[in-house]
Each structure stands twice: as C-alpha cells, then as structure tokens.
Amino acid sequence: MIKEIALENFKCYKKLNTIQLAKVNLLAGSNGRGKSSFIQALLLLAQSLDSEKGLNHLEMNGRFVELGTFADVQNSESKGNLTIRYKTDDKDESDILISFSSYENKTQWGEIISFTLSGKELIEEMGSATGENGEQKSHGLGVTSTVAGLSQLYNVYYISADRRGPVDFVKKNDNRDDNQIGIHGEFLINSLAKKGKDFTDKVASELSKILSGATIQVENTDTDYLRFYLDSVNDSKGFRPTNVGFGYSYILPIVMTLMLAEKGAKIFIENPEAHLHPGAQSRLADFLMRKSKERDLQLFIETHSDHIINGLRIAIVDGILEESDARILFFSREGLGDTNVYQIKIDSKGNLSDYPDGFMDEWGIQMSKLV
C-alpha cells in the first residue's frame, strides 16, 4: 500500500507537502481544486514505469492519462523540477523520491534526474558524447529500476469519469487481457464473453444488489461482433442497453473492475456516483468498501457525493473497515495559490475530525433558505 505522497511543481501543487493515505481514500472538494491532478500524478508514474523506457522518461501520453507535454504539467509559477515522493508499507517501508526535468531543453520530455530510496541516490549518470567540450549528460535508473517500492505502481487499475455509455454490440477482440476492461469500460463486453456465464451471473448479482434488479447477457454471434443485453429486473431476457437506464452501463465498469482486480491492487475511480439514484449510491459505497476489505484493494475515489462519503463512515461503524483504513482528502484552493489538502479522519462512531468550508454543507445551506 502507498501510505503517503507529496507532489512538488506538478500542476497546482507547488510545495512538497505530505498527504497521508489509507486503504480507502475519498477525494472531495470543489471543481478545479486538484483532485484529478492528484490522481494523474500517480497514474503518470504507473504508465511511465510500464512503458519501454521505464521511469527514465515520463510517459506523458499513455494508457491511463494523456497530459500533453512536460511543460503542460509543470507548476505555472515555478517551472522547476517536478518531484514526486511516496512511502509504502512493504517490509522495507520504502521511501521514494523521484525528480524529473525537461529533457535537453525539449519541453515535451521529462527526464529523470534523481531517484532516492530511503535517502540513497540510485541514479546512474550516462554520458552521450558530442565532443570533449560539448559532452551532454543523460540519466537513467538502469538495472536499479526493480528497486523495492516500485512494485506498488505495477498493479494499477483506472476507471475514468468519462465512461462508455450504453453499447448494443462490439467487435470481438481475443487479444486483450480479460482482467483489464479499459479506462472507459471499452473492453468490458469482450471480457464478459471470455470469462463466461458463471462470472457474468456473479456480476449481475452484484449489480442487482446495488440497483435493485439486473440482468446481463452476452450473445456470441456467428459474425465478428458480440451482442450485449441488459435489464433492470432479475432473470429476464434482457434488452438493448440503449433501452435501459443509463446508470446500469455507467456503473458496470466499476463493479467488474473490483471483481477482476488482482489482490493488493491500486484502483482509481472517478465519480462512481454518476447517473445513480441516492439509494444506489449508498449501496455502491457499501460494495466498494466490502471489496476493498475482501481483496486488500487500495482505493482512490474522486467523488462529489455525500452518500459515498457517508458510506465510508457507515463501513467503519459496521466494522467493515477499521478507522485506520479510511481517509477523506478535501481539496481547497484560493485563486492562484497552492492547493491545500485537509486530511479528515473518521472515528469508530463515524464522526469526522474536520468540516472545512465547502465540505458536506450544501444541504444545510439550502435548508436554511427554505425555513
């Protein structure tokens, strides 16, 4: 598990301030305050580590995020080196600090210039000769790219806020990893087809608990396409998803990912509450917390839903999670200033340690106008 992180000169994060993390982390706050940037920083490291060059260069546009150029993610007021520091809870309790700079003055690249593990520098400097007086230097991790702590960034899943809506059929694709359904859920139907009816029925059962009824069917046709059917009641023949409530298609990638993810995985989810009735949001929260416990998943959930937040509180009251398993991160920012992250804890009775302005207060504000 990643137990803390700090960002410096990454988008709205100017100073290296430490943020404590837990098994389940809810990211809340007004729009444009740094929640998505927080998620992007970790996804950027994960996709870079998984790329051909590893962490020697930042993979700015990859399988998780497309962020443009290195200059696009540098803090606009600083333009200094981009630094990410994180600690893990593995047996070595790795403390990793990584810094990147623009590559040979080319703003589209981010080249690694420092990698320290618990205070020890592991970067190798490699010369790229262009003459005695004009020799340039590049840096690389070399064989040290397998150091402890980096394994925390390999087992990563991401479900974007921009999920694929209702789809009636897709082209067959047998070359995909059936445990990876895509950040938009674009490979979901192929994954269901490969997993078979037993798994599909299990997904339908979980979906039914959240949405009070569900049927899922995949028809393997004689053509190059798979047909997909949904319904809002159990044990039906199903209908085209375009004729069923939008929430079914939008929640399905979340349910499947938590059922397919390897144990110990890091899962990033944006706006799980989208297109869901408040009751369904609460039941989804219960599903998320239970799966986190059962499968030892570390969750990072960006949400604007009080029902998701209260679901985390209830999970602690009901004993599904321990107090130390939960953290609410509330992101705030004034004008062009630094992003401030309030780290809110939950006690055994579900009480919150802090209520910063703008956090779970809109209901009270509206009620005061109605009385």
Where does each model-flagged region fall?
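Phosphate-coordinating catalytic segments in nucleotide- and nucleic-acid-processing enzymes
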Residues: 49-257, 262, 344-371
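Switch/communication elements of ASCE P-loop NTPase nucleotide-binding domains
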Residues: 1-73, 199, 213, 219-371
